[in-house]
């Protein structure tokens, strides 16, 4: 019984591999990037996003909710979707995202980096140059500056009185 299970698992993986092959028949190199599954991790401030892109219809699932439910702001929706729009791949991938920590802006930035890294992993030759030029593969290193002792905030000092 165990042999049959292993054989069926091998058959399924062979079919899956065949469905996502990168080989083309004619006109190789003339089309856009390959449609295959990919994974990327993005970080921004305190937020961490784990992004899976699978061939599909352009549906977003962020922590089990749609893009519009999770990010009501059109600005954040546009930011998250910008790497896909840049490469003209709208409607070709479904995004499954798990994002944790930070606020909405940090999470949107983390998802954008994760999506860009996933697209880079899918087809490095076709996608990397455009993503790099737009700055989507660069991690935004800006984080909140820590509070210092003797100050009210990171840099705000107590009011000075000459006398």
Swiss-Prot record:
One Pfam family in the UniProt entry: Ribosomal_S9
Disulfide bridge positions per record: none
InterPro entries: Ribosomal_Su5_D2-typ_SF, Ribosomal_uS9, Ribosomal_uS9_bac/plastid, Ribosomal_uS9_CS, Ribsml_uS5_D2-typ_fold_subgr
Source taxonomy: Bacteria, Bacillati, Actinomycetota, Actinomycetes, Bifidobacteriales
GO cellular component: cytoplasm; small ribosomal subunit
BP GO annotations: translation
PROSITE patterns linked: RIBOSOMAL_S9
Species, as recorded: Bifidobacterium animalis subsp. lactis (strain AD011)
Family: Belongs to the universal ribosomal protein uS9 family.
UniProt entry keywords in alphabetical sequence: Ribonucleoprotein, Ribosomal protein
HAMAP family: Ribosomal_uS9_B (MF_00532_B)
Low complexity composition bias: residue spans: 1-25
Protein name, UniProt field: Small ribosomal subunit protein uS9
Highest taxon of source: Bacteria
An example Gene Ontology molecular-function term: RNA binding
UniProt region (Disordered), positions on chain: 1-40
């Amino acid at each position: 019984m165990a042999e049959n299970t292993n054989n069926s698992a091998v058959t399924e993986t062979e079919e899956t591999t065949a469905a996502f092959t990168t080989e083309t028949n004619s006109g190789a190199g003339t089309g856009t990037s390959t449609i295959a599954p990919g994974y990327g991790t993005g970080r921004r401030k305190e937020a961490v996003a784990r992004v899976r892109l699978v061939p599909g219809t352009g549906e977003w699932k962020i922590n089990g909710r749609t893009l519009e439910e999770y990010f009501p702001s059109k600005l954040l929706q546009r930011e998250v979707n910008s790497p896909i729009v840049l490469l003209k791949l709208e409607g070709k991938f479904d995004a499954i995202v798990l994002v944790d920590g930070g606020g909405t802006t940090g999470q949107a930035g983390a998802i954008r980096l994760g999506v860009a890294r996933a697209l880079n992993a899918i087809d490095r030759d076709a996608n990397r140059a455009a993503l790099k030029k737009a700055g989507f593969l660069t991690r935004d290193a800006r984080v909140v500056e820590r509070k210092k002792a003797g100050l009210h905030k990171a840099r705000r000092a107590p009011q000075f009185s000459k006398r």
